Each structure stands twice: as C-alpha cells, then as structure tokens.
C-alpha cells in the first residue's frame, strides 16, 4: 500500500483486481463508484499522479479534460438523469486527481446542492453498495456507451 489511495486503486486495476473497473482510456481509468446513493456515480481517475490540473503537461491535460467530458456524456446516456455534477476534489491520501461524475435527478436528495450535503452515514450506507450482479449490469450499460464513443 502506498501513501496514495488512488494509486493503490490504479494498481488493483492493473492487476485485474478492481471489480469496479469499467474501461482504460488514454489518460485515465473509468470506474463505477463504490456506493451508488446517486445511481450511476462514476469516477474518472487520472493515470498521472498529480493533484492539480495545472501540474499536467498541456497536451495531456487537454486530452484528460476531453476524455472526462466524454465519460460524463456516456454516464448521462447510460444512467438517464436531469443533470451531471462534475467534481474534482481530493484531500489526505486521495489528492491524486480523479473526477467524481454524479448523475443527478429531480428530488434525489433531501436538500438542493452538491451531493456532499447528504450525510456521510447515508452517502456511504451499505444499502448503496451495489451487489455483484448490479455492478456487472452497471459496467455493461456504461461500457456500451463508452464503446460508441471510444471504439
């Protein structure tokens, strides 16, 4: 285990041991979020260990942003929603750049605003952890949309 939990996830993915992995792209990895409080929640992890966009070489940065936008479009089509929320956060052992892509639907949370207004105990409740079957179905649905754009 490294000091970066995101790098650890990348290593799991490379070893074929990340059940949430959907697709490798030129600049990053598409993975289904561990918890699905917002159905279709997806993460796009940067292949380069950097915490800020300005730390990336310009051509890579522009390609990463383009791919993130295309992944978000695929999420939108795979998991119909009213709006996509994009968030590039990071703190502690999770500063390695990764986009949180949240499909949002009218009335999907008790308060309007970012998903982080939902209490942590609800956001990360075991009831929102997809079963193996649900996860495989989500990966297949998103994979089909990614195929249309990236193949």
Where are these regions (language model features)?
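HIT superfamily nucleotide-processing domains
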Residues: 1-151
């Amino acid at each position: 285990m490294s000091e970066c939990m995101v790098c650890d996830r990348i290593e799991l993915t490379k070893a074929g041991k990340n059940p949430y992995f959907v697709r490798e792209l030129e600049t990053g990895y598409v993975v289904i979020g561990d918890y699905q409080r917002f159905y279709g929640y997806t993460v796009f992890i940067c292949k380069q260990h950097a915490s800020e966009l300005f730390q990336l070489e310009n051509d890579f940065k522009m390609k990463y942003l383009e791919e993130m936008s295309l992944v978000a479009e695929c999420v939108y089509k795979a998991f119909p929603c009213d709006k996509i929320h994009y968030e590039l956060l990071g703190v502690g052992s999770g500063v390695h750049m990764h986009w949180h892509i949240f499909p949002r639907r009218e009335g999907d949370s008790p308060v309007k605003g970012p998903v982080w207004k939902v209490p942590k105990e609800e956001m990360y409740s075991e009831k929102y952890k997809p079963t193996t079957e649900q996860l495989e179905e989500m990966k297949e649905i998103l994979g089909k949309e990614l195929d249309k754009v990236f193949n």
